[in-house]
């Protein structure tokens, strides 16, 4: 029997980076967790909470110290994952979500802290999935989820412009374009 993608909790699921997609499946563990914990609050409602916690707890200097003490030679930050939220105040506006990005430059702050300690800095950018452009909720196997990959020219232009912006602003030593 083929295992369903969201049929049971795992160490990295269901409350992690694919949360927005997973909560859209009504019978998934994530959807049940979300309903029990947050009611019917939409995913976008977490943006103010995230930004408030950032203002209180984000300490890129402490992160860089930890990486340096661990012997890291480089650090790669997820600058935009599949939910489309950017960790820098991008000049390239998301056409489907207003103000869908951090007002604080988390990428720049961590890049400066990492480089000040002699480590290299890289950026990860989800090129192949952005659920603010397309979220497929039919099916529950990984092959069905991959149908969420946006294929429009508007998305290609948007992603390209943001990647150019990342390169121009941060000069990453590593540029990781996921699923693209």
PLM regions and their residue ranges:
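Mature catalytic domains of secreted/periplasmic carbohydrate-active enzymes
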Residues: 1-180
């Amino acid at each position: 029997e083929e295992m369903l993608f969201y049929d049971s909790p795992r160490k990295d699921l269901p409350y992690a980076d694919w949360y927005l997609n997973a909560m859209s499946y009504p019978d998934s563990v994530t959807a049940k967790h979300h309903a029990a914990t947050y009611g019917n609050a939409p995913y976008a409602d977490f943006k103010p909470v995230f930004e408030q916690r950032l203002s209180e707890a984000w300490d890129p200097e402490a992160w860089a110290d930890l990486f340096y003490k661990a012997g890291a030679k480089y650090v790669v930050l997820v600058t935009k994952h599949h939910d489309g939220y950017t960790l820098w105040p991008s000049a390239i506006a998301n056409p489907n979500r207003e103000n869908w990005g951090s007002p604080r430059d988390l990428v720049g702050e961590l890049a400066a802290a990492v480089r000040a300690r002699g480590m290299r800095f890289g950026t990860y950018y989800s090129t192949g999935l952005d659920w603010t452009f397309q979220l497929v909720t039919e099916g529950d196997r990984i092959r069905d989820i991959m149908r969420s990959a946006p294929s429009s020219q508007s998305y290609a232009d948007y992603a390209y412009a943001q990647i150019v912006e990342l390169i121009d602003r941060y000069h990453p030593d590593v540029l990781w374009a996921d699923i693209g």
